[in-house]
């Protein structure tokens, strides 16, 4: 009966199946296998607990090694890719970005079965040169794009957005619910990865950069904060405590205030934004702050206030500035979230 149904009806039905059900259906016959493969980006995804990239072979104990070879990858390149990369890349290109370990990295995946963690180590070519390398990387990256991950942790490595662009264009994205990214180099490429190839619920970015570098990419960072359709919450951690970095933090704060108060459309802004600064200079409250309330609790100063939009006064954002001091210096955390109009 399913065979004769229109494609859109079959797709609607298959969307009710979980990943295990889809795997079972694929094994019944070639028709269902090809149909599910064709629409796998719209159907249930294989779920993993975590993904990260590391050089530590013993990470997670003794993970199961997955080291594919091109002869075992039953996946022909499309005619377009076959023609484009028949002789491999003109210049070798790394799978991941890393200042120190670009030639040596492993993808670690964690999956939970019956409340027990299982670890996998996916060893792909670190430097892609040949057509066979391209075939392996294309196949497995495409599989990862069609999975979902609860956590992602990218400290020393990140997938190379230039490689993704060459193989897939900008259409492919990793689905990671809670993702943490550290930035101490290649900021432009990492921002490109976040904008084009990452989607999830929460994103945390730890910056270990000087102010002069951050300023160059301030507009790109602000564009990330306007991706409310991709992220529900973004936390920016500024670990550099130099005077120059403090100046940039003030500029970013003022840029957010200006957008909230004057933009004709605030709907695209990420609903919750957290800025955390270490050892900042004395924080200056915006003159546009309304309904200011200040209180101290256990040595921590809390300043709550609102910023209204002049184009539409019903659009309001609430702020909470949390200022504290300790043995390791002072810190300021600013939480910004959109107030939704009560019906």
Predicted regions and their residues:
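Leucine-rich repeat
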Residues: 93-149, 153-199, 208-214
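Seven-transmembrane-like multi-pass membrane architecture, highlighting hydrophobic TM helices
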Residues: 20, 25-31, 101, 133, ...
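Universal eukaryotic N-terminal targeting presequences
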Residues: 1-2, 343
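Residue-level detector of alpha-helical recognition elements and their boundaries
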Residues: 28-29, 47, 167, 236, ...
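Conserved phosphate-interacting/catalytic interface
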Residues: 200-343
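Short non-domain terminal segments
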Residues: 46, 60, 73, 83, ...
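Skp1-binding F-box subdomain of Cullin-RING ligase substrate receptors
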Residues: 3-91, 95-96, 150-153, 172-183, ...
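Alpha-helical structural signal with a strong bias for long, charge-/Ser/Thr/Gly-rich
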Residues: 80, 85-111, 115, 302-333
């Amino acid at each position: 009966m399913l065979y004769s149904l229109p494609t859109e009806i079959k797709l609607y039905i298959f969307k009710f199946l979980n990943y295990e059900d889809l795997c079972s259906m694929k094994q019944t016959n070639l028709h269902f296998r090809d149909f599910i493969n064709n629409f796998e980006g719209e159907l249930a995804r294989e779920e993993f607990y975590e993904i990260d990239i590391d050089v530590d072979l013993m990470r997670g104990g003794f993970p199961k090694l997955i080291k594919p070879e091109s002869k075992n990858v039953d996946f022909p390149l499309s005619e377009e890719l076959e023609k484009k990369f028949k002789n491999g890349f003109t210049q070798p290109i790394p799978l991941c970005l890393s200042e120190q370990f670009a030639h040596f990295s492993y993808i670690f995946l964690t999956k939970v079965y019956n409340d027990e963690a299982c670890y996998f180590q996916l060893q792909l070519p670190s430097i892609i040169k040949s057509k066979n390398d391209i075939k392996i990387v294309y196949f497995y990256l495409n599989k990862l794009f069609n999975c979902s991950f609860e956590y992602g942790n990218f400290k020393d490595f990140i997938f190379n957005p230039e490689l993704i662009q060459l193989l897939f264009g900008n259409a492919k994205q990793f689905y990671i619910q809670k993702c943490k990214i550290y930035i101490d180099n290649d900021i432009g490429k990492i921002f490109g990865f976040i904008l084009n190839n990452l989607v999830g619920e929460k994103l945390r970015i730890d910056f270990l950069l000087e102010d002069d570098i951050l300023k160059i990419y301030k507009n790109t960072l602000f564009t990330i904060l306007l991706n409310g359709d991709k992220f529900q919450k973004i936390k920016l951690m500024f670990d550099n405590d130099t005077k120059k970095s403090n100046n940039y933090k003030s500029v970013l704060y003022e840029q957010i205030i200006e957008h909230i108060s004057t933009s004709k459309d605030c709907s695209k802004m990420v609903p919750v934004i957290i800025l955390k600064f270490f050892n900042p200079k004395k924080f200056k409250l915006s003159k546009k702050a309304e309904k200011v309330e200040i209180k101290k609790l256990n040595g921590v100063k809390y300043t709550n206030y609102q910023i209204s939009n002049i184009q539409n006064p019903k659009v309001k954002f609430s702020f909470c500035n949390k200022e504290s001091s300790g043995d390791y210096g002072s810190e300021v955390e600013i939480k910004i979230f959109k107030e939704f109009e009560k019906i």
